[in-house]
Amino acid sequence: MDELTPRQSEILAWIRARMAEDSLPPTRAELMRAFDFRSPNAAESHLRVLARKGYILLQSGTARGIRLCASEEETGLPLIGRVAAGQPMLAEEFREGQLPVDPKLFSPGADYLLRVQGMSMRDAGILDGDILAVRHDASLTLQDGQMVVARVNGEVTVKRWKRDGKQVWLLPENPDFSPISVDLQRDSLTIEGVVVGLLRIGGNL
């Protein structure tokens, strides 16, 4: 790979650190703010140089489309600590490690793995302790019935998505649990990803 300038090395080190900390690639806007670039185009220009020199890959059509090249990253997918799949809990995300799972095993490809806690998605075949493969892509248009990882007022839960205008319902797959009602004009809602697969350690995929 071509040698980097000090500035390019600084940007690459920042990208690595962000991905290690958050387990997700940074956005162009985050890069722009971190380095006080005057425009997104300046951030994009630096990213394209890193890509041309073989340090990163750029995926079009997504805000978090930065990927470290194979020689720059660990193999597999990062495993994020337990997430509520029952009543939502205050999520303090942490990285448990890296699992040797090919992202391309799933369609669309997964960005990270997330451990489930609780039985609210039992009837969808998701049990306590299972590991979900999650695609984090802000450009995806959610369809009713899709399974999502949602952060509601700071708390994380795994549920099925249903929307009617400004009203969202996060639906469990277990009659012992109640739907979560979200008013988009009042509540804070962030979609942390769409579930694209299931892993059960010691069992079948």
Curated annotation (Swiss-Prot):
* Site feature: Cleavage: A85, G86
Instruction: Give GO BP annotations, semicolon-separated.
Output: DNA repair; DNA replication; negative regulation of DNA-templated transcription; proteolysis; SOS response
| Pfam family of the protein (one) | Peptidase_S24
Reaction catalyzed:
Hydrolysis of Ala-|-Gly bond in repressor LexA
List the Gene Ontology MF annotations in alphabetical order.
DNA binding; serine-type endopeptidase activity
Q: What class of enzyme is it?
A: hydrolase
> Does Nucleotide-binding count among this protein's keywords?
no
Record EC number: 3.4.21.88
Report if keyword Repeat is assigned: no
Q: Keywords assigned by UniProt? A: Autocatalytic cleavage, DNA damage, DNA repair, DNA replication, DNA-binding, Hydrolase, Repressor, SOS response, Transcription, Transcription regulation
The DNA-binding region ranges are 28-48
- Name of the protein: LexA repressor
